[in-house]
UniProtKB/Swiss-Prot annotation:
Gene Ontology CC: ribonucleoprotein complex; ribosome
Gene label: rplW
Stated family: Belongs to the universal ribosomal protein uL23 family.
Function: One of the early assembly proteins it binds 23S rRNA. One of the proteins that surrounds the polypeptide exit tunnel on the outside of the ribosome. Forms the main docking site for trigger factor binding to the ribosome.
GO MF terms held by the record: rRNA binding; structural constituent of ribosome
Keywords, sorted A to Z: Ribonucleoprotein, Ribosomal protein, RNA-binding, rRNA-binding
Subunit structure: Part of the 50S ribosomal subunit. Contacts protein L29, and trigger factor when it is bound to the ribosome.
Organism of derivation: Nautilia profundicola (strain ATCC BAA-1463 / DSM 18972 / AmH)
Species lineage: Bacteria, Pseudomonadati, Campylobacterota, Epsilonproteobacteria, Nautiliales
Example GO BP: translation
Top-level taxon: Bacteria
InterPro entries, A to Z: Nucleotide-bd_a/b_plait_sf, Ribosomal_uL23-like, Ribosomal_uL23/eL15/eS24_sf
Pfam families: Ribosomal_L23
Name used for this protein in its record: Large ribosomal subunit protein uL23
Gene3D superfamilies named in the record: 3.30.70.330
């Protein structure tokens, strides 16, 4: 079962901020979280039932540092459509 600690961060890019005006929140999580689990997290911790949840898997970038190749961890990104009357004060910019 997923919980609030599986949410790594809220994404604040230019695209994400434009989507936020339309009521869509972009969330980065661990790869094991599913759409239904994320809906339950939003219901339990934020008291909001998402209207729609879209997800995508993102591969971690391969990076080099002083000739040694490393890899950033893989993650999952969710686009969460919230109701118009929903306000998440703790998550807004």
């Amino acid at each position: 079962m997923a919980d609030i600690t599986d949410i790594k961060s809220i994404v604040y890019t230019e695209k994400a901020l434009n989507l936020q005006e339309q009521g869509v929140l972009v969330v980065q999580t661990t790869p094991k979280v599913t759409k239904n689990q994320l809906k339950e997290i939003f219901k339990e911790y934020f008291g909001v039932t998402p209207l729609k949840v879209n997800s995508l898997r993102q591969k971690g970038k391969v990076k080099r540092f002083r000739g040694i190749e490393g890899k950033r961890p893989d993650y999952k990104k969710f686009y969460v459509k919230l109701p118009e009357d929903a306000k998440l004060e703790s998550l807004s910019v």
